[in-house]
Each structure stands twice: as C-alpha cells, then as structure tokens.
Amino acid sequence: MSKKRKTLSLTAYQNTDAIEERKMGQITVEKNVGGIEGLCVITPAVHGDARGYFMETYNENDMKEAGIDIKFVQDNQSMSTKGVLRGLHFQKQYPQCKLVRAVRGNVFDVAVDLRADSKTYGKWYGVELSAENKKQFLIPEGFAHGFLVLSEEAEFCYKVNDFYHPNDEGGMAWNDPEIGIEWPQVKGEYPGNAVADGYELEDGTKLNLSEKDQKWLGLKETFRF
C-alpha cells in the first residue's frame, strides 16, 4: 500500500517569497531556499579550539523549534570519487524526506520540485555541501534528488523518513534542458538523453553515472507527486 506524501505545513513554510534565516539552539536554518517551499539549508554551530571541534549533527528539539517535525527511520552513507553524479532519484509510492550532508570532501547537491500542486513545479535548487562548511540540506517528500562529487573523493550521509523500497525507484534525467540544472565545472553538449559520454569536469575528469541513471527521461515523462 502506498504512503500519502506528507506536507511540511508548519509556520516555517508559509512565506515562500523570500528566504528566512533563523537561529534555533545549535542550528541556523535558511527556509524556502530558492523560493521553493520546504527546502531548507541548515548550518550547525561548531565549537572549536586548539584540540579540534564539536558539533551536534542532529537535534530533534532544535528542528521542531524551527518548525520541522520529521521522524527519520534510516541513516545512509556512500563514498564516491570525483566526477561521480548520482541522480536524480526519488521513490514514487513511498516518498522520502532527506536530510543530507557531506562528511568528507565536497559535493554539489540538487533538489528538483516534482510536486504537481506546487507553484515551483520543475524548479531546481543546488547547494555546495562540504566537510568544511558542514551545511545540511533538507529535502521534503516530492522532490528528485542528486549530487555531483567535486573533490577527489566524498563521503555523503543522509537521513530518510521512510525505508528503501527497491521496487519503487524513480528518477529523471540529470541534464534535462527543460530543468536546466547548472552543474558546476561540467562541460559538454546535451545529446538528447541522460548519457554521460562527452561530459567532463573542467580538469578533464570524465563524468561518471550508473547505467540506470543514464536511462532516466526528462521532466515531461517523469512521475509527478
């Protein structure tokens, strides 16, 4: 049985015309980034001295104070090398809210709004996540998600509010010109599909996508929530 997509409808998301930045306990939250309802960039407070640093990577109370009340059920971690692009992914009948961050290296992380009832349907937003800036990106249910590795290697962690359902995978082309994602450092001409051949980073690193991710179609042929 499919799960109905939940809407993050608290006061944190009522004003979608401008980015609102608020400090909540040990986090600073930028809400509705890119003018897209529900997308948030979260920056934790880092307490450092000559020994190193300490930070809270997740605090349920701070999140609730920011108007974000999500029950996460699974944590995932991946390692990828430079030029790897993973995405754009979603689950159709079991949509996932994701809270993502890079714990090593540097990635460009992207979310595309696939909510049919959204005034920003088809709009994308991207943010650089790195071990240095320690930013986290909150992506509600109803979005396609992906990232590009810009460092030699990157370790990527994400919390999700529903489990992985392998028979429910969905995706869309990372390079669909109708969406027009501006992937940093990527050079190449659109071949009419999601195939990575002919694409590379500015330093000559070939773009690296899975076979599955090179078969996804564009926005017009993609599932809507």
Per-range role (PLM):
Residues 3-132, 151-153, 160-225:
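Non-catalytic, conserved peripheral segments adjacent to functional cores
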